[in-house]
Amino acid sequence: MTITHNLGFPRIGAQRELKRAVEAYWSGKKTAADLEETGRELRAAHWQRQAASGLQWVPVGDFAWYDHILEWTTLLGAVPARFGQPEGQPVSLDTLFRMGRGRAPSGTPTAACEMTKWFDTNYHYIVPELVPGQTFRIAREYLFEQVQEAQALGHQVKPVIPGPLTWLWQGKGDAYAGGASDAAKLQLLDTLLPVYAEVLARLARLGVEWVQIDEPILVLDLPQAWRDAFRTAYARLADAPVKLLVATYFGGLNDNLATALALPVAGLHVDLIRAPGQLQDVAAGLRPGQVLSAGIIDGRNIWRTDLDAALAALAPARQLLGERLWLAPSCSLLHVPVDLANETDLDAELRSWLSFAAQKLDELGLLGRALADARAPGVDEALAAQRAALRARRQSARIHNPAVGRRMAESNAVTRERAPFAERIARQQQLLKLPAFPTTTIGSFPQTAEIRALRRDWKSGALSDSAYEAAIRKEIESVIRFQEKIGLDVLVHGEPERNDMVEYFGELLAGFAFTRNGWVQSYGSRCVKPPIIFGDVARPAPMTVGWSSYAQSLTDKPVKGMLTGPVTILQWSFVRDDQPREQTCRQLALALRDEVVDLEQAGVRVIQIDEPAIREGLPLRRADWQAYLDWAVDCFRLSTAGVAADTQIHTHMCYSEFNDIIESIAAMDADVITIETSRSNMELLKAFEDFRYPNDIGPGVYDIHSPNVPDVDWMVGLMRKAAGRLPSERLWVNPDCGLKTRAWPETEAALVGMVEAARALRAG
């Protein structure tokens, strides 16, 4: 027998049921009881699907209303004072939502907690806020209730909780100036670990045998103080009346191997997709009786698994460990869509290459049966079918485009250089004539139900091309007139034609495919549907020129052309795994270069190439950074360097803690960079104390992820803080991010206030 288990399942539902239920609750259309019922239905369906795949245990604790780290933060009672949590009382669902998004059906609206990327994924977590002397207690019962819920349905359960070291590492606080690795946070372990021990004891009383405790920071560059803390923390949990499976993922243990192997725990999970070479060393270092969970199915991409290769890789460990070798996905399946069975629109050939969360569990079950007994009934036939699908993909004529191959071969000779910034900015100012502290937005405007219905009707054929174009033009004109009315300086067309900043471009590029229900959670209730890059990328025709040139024709003010950058398209897609990511990114850059040149020729003289994902692409280990940054910067410059000096190139980056890569950001040589800084109170600008950023910069002055309207004086204060580090003549005033997810009333109020703040700055 081979034990198979899962680290976590997508929580959103195959049809995004959780998103709809949560948003209906926020808007007052559903009650809390309605929301709880939806949660129970989803959990039951997810547990049943996982059990049907043959898992020994179903995970409990992977479900979350907004974010699993936020769930755990509230269970620990770590609620910042501004949320008014009554001492000793349970943390309510509305308090959780206020921490995540700033407001809820009850409770006073207040500034949300910071949100940032989860390791190098496109998932966002809510950052725990920590203070010296922080107290902890069990302040919510959801974990224990859900364990009993699953048990009542007949399931064997494996609770999943964030580990104490990873939770602390991901936390922040004003007193912890050193960032995520600040060793001062480790002093909180003395009050944190007793609550962990209490949680584990209560789980044991519910009949739980195994608890998965996630410690993915073991794949990072850890300071020695944190390695030492692992040993002392888990020594204090060693007497817990449950077996602990410490789960690591997103990379290899490397120099943390000895630390991980020394932990007094019953099992260790490792990622064999990102770090296949660690299997032998980990297996050899286990203590007698200790379990190794092999993360052998890719939890972050959507391609079918080469089960023959997996079996060959696992064979030595199986021989060494026997049934102490467990099988699992590499990480939580949170990062992939729910079920390929819903993709009836995909052509059969492409569909046969794919595997979503449900299918990955089926692959896992097949792998477990094959490892235990390759002669078991049905195993050989199932492996043969898997083999045939992989062979068909390798041999498909859809994968390679000879024209793209020829252009790639010549790409090293294509210029990446523009005139010096001082020369460019002088020529741009002569052309654009912008005031001090120029105002702009990041690109998108609110996507109303009417706009979404318009696109849906057009795609379904219910609306003609001419009627659709007329309606989109009307919306663009409305957005232009609004921006003129409130006094913005550099306008945007609002992107009403775009459902998503990556999917829109993918639909117009060769080498991409799209799903109908391939949704994954990005943050809170926001889900994205990543395109699939299955083959060589090329641009058959202009993608944005018509809409952007029309918008520019409506006004004398400059209108930005809006593109998504090559690195972000790469990062936010499911990328082919048959060639290096760098090569796919360069194909994207060449396609975008053609679009940039066409926009300039159409009279669009300000062009924004968004790269919000450039930092998330950073390898988790610092030793691997420079190689990535070299090709990422090269791809950006390749996409932007084909225009004249007086065409202004903007780029945008959100949630980007890139203080430590600022030299590479400067090397991108965008004329203007706009960044996310409001939630972190301009924390990013610490980089400029040591580095003199050479070009213009727009530090975001309000958080678009919260519906709260920012105070004018607060925005002025943020900009004055920025001006203390940067020359004021190089500062722009803008929101943190695009306005797509916001409603019009709050958008109008916020932008009017932002323009007022800019005018106050100009007045001194």
UniProtKB/Swiss-Prot annotation:
Keywords: Amino-acid biosynthesis, Metal-binding, Methionine biosynthesis, Methyltransferase, Repeat, Transferase, Zinc
Cofactor note: Binds 1 zinc ion per subunit.
Binding positions for 5-methyltetrahydropteroyltri-L-glutamate per the UniProt entry: 16-19, 117, 526-527, 572, 616
GO molecular function: 5-methyltetrahydropteroyltriglutamate-homocysteine S-methyltransferase activity; zinc ion binding
Family annotation (InterPro entries): Cbl-indep_Met_Synth_N, Cobalamin-indep_Met_synthase, Met_Synth_C/arc, UROD/MetE-like_sf
Pathway: Amino-acid biosynthesis; L-methionine biosynthesis via de novo pathway; L-methionine from L-homocysteine (MetE route): step 1/1
Catalytic activity: 5-methyltetrahydropteroyltri-L-glutamate + L-homocysteine = tetrahydropteroyltri-L-glutamate + L-methionine
Binding site for L-methionine: 442-444, 495, 610
Amino-acid biosynthesis in keyword set: yes
Positions of L-homocysteine binding: 442-444, 495, 610
Binding site for Zn(2+): 652, 654, 676, 737
Gene Ontology biological-process annotations: methionine biosynthetic process; methylation
Cofactor: Zn(2+)
Catalytic site positions: 705
Similarity-based family: Belongs to the vitamin-B12 independent methionine synthase family.
NCBIfam families named in the record: met_syn_B12ind, PRK05222.1
Protein name as catalogued: 5-methyltetrahydropteroyltriglutamate--homocysteine methyltransferase
Species assigned in the record: Bordetella petrii (strain ATCC BAA-461 / DSM 12804 / CCUG 43448)
